[in-house]
Amino acid sequence: MKRKLTGLFGAPVSDRENSMTAGPRGPLLMQDIYFLEQMAHFDREVIPERRMHAKGSGAFGTFTVTNDITKYTCASIFAEVGKQTEMFARFSTVAGERGAGDAERDIRGFALKFYTDEGNWDLVGNNTPVFFFRDPKLFPSLNHVVKRNPKTNMKDPQANWDFWTLLPEALHQITILMTDRGIPKGFRNMHGFGSHTYSMYNDKGERFWVKFHHRTQQGIENYSAEEAEQVMAKDRDSSQRDLFNNIEQGNFPKWKMYIQVMTEEQARNHKDNPFDLTKVWYKDEYPLIEVGEFELNRNPENYFQDVEQAAFAPTNIVPGLDFSPDKMLQGRLFSYGDTQRYRLGVNHWQIPVNQPKGVGMENICPFSRDGHMRILDNNQGASTHYYPNSNGAFEDQPQYKKPALDIQGQAYEYDFREDDDNYFEQPGKLFRLLSSEEQQILFNNTANEMSPVTDALKHRHIRHCYKADPAYGQGVAEAMGIDINEVDLDVAD
């Protein structure tokens, strides 16, 4: 049975195709209210795109606990082996706009939202375990250099590489990005990482530092630079198509979740800053501990409703999980929620994909009121709108207080380079883990990506690579057609 057309407020529509005019060939009349309503809505259809991670794909699924980690955390989501929790995942490219090609060389976003029975837990990460820098003050500049030049409105490799090579700590991330892992074949075929150091605490109040790893069960598959060009020439939505079609066909992708755990005592004695996002924790020192598995098994019915309006923020945590002194994480605690309030409004938590389904909307009792689009909870009705109050309308839940975190030091803008200038050890170790064929691919990809930039930037990058491993610097120089003897390798970084 066909549905009968109405306007937004229920009035029947008599003619969807023909506007009201003064005579059959006369001008349009402004009293054609359906035309006005449709055009006014159309003019406002597009909401601001994300400043980063603009183009994404998403799916719903289920997380299942497969190993007991209750000695580390009292979070209910991990309470017992076999416990299941509904979830939503969003994958994305990072630098590109909404129309970006899925097979571009770029980091991939890997954001997870778990609808736990203690509230939503958002684990916001990428497909790499590290990042370009370790201070969030650099975030706006990173965005600017990977986006478009303000004069030409074109991508600007010179600005991009100038910024990256002025940050020697970026070499670790750059090295990963310039391997074939910089272009995953699809979202199903890549690992994910929480990247930041988070913390867990148990029912005894003991705190542990943790890193999250999500290992694909479909196997790692990547495109070469040449393959990626061919794919994008035919299909700019290749990763989204792959994810959507496989789920529709019942071929549900799965990932295993693991954690690395570091005690507070180990952190105090760790060689490097354990909260430095440009470095990893070595697995031989902090082995992977299995936590669970998640499966994505349902596509959204409407992309805009569930994927475009999905709002992730690392501030969405639950009892038993907490933050760390990681400065990048601390910066994201503000920025993520703030961008969602700008994109979607202060009441974006009422959008279905963002609702705390595991708790139930009827049990949500925030103290916030009003704001654009406050529609689902009667705006708390006539209940008391201040606290404390004499009628006992609300009460805290002190049993969920977090254990104390020992923080010491004087407030100051510390130069992190004076604290830790060990930029090149881990990129060097990563380079030596690559096969000779993979190393050559790294050289060639780097030379290709840097081909538009000046020799001064090439020399700077070669110097960083050389400091990580002489063979790394030599290989990049040869791929660029540069005599390494012409590069000043002794400049301090």
From Swiss-Prot:
Binding residues annotated for heme, in chain numbering: Y336
Any one of the GO BP annotations: hydrogen peroxide catabolic process
Keywords assigned: Heme, Hydrogen peroxide, Iron, Metal-binding, Oxidoreductase, Peroxidase
GO molecular function: catalase activity; heme binding; metal ion binding
Top-level enzyme category: oxidoreductase
Catalytic reaction annotation: 2 H2O2 = O2 + 2 H2O
Subunit note: Homodimer.
Function recorded in the entry: Decomposes hydrogen peroxide into water and oxygen; serves to protect cells from the toxic effects of hydrogen peroxide.
Protein name: Catalase A
Organism: Staphylococcus xylosus
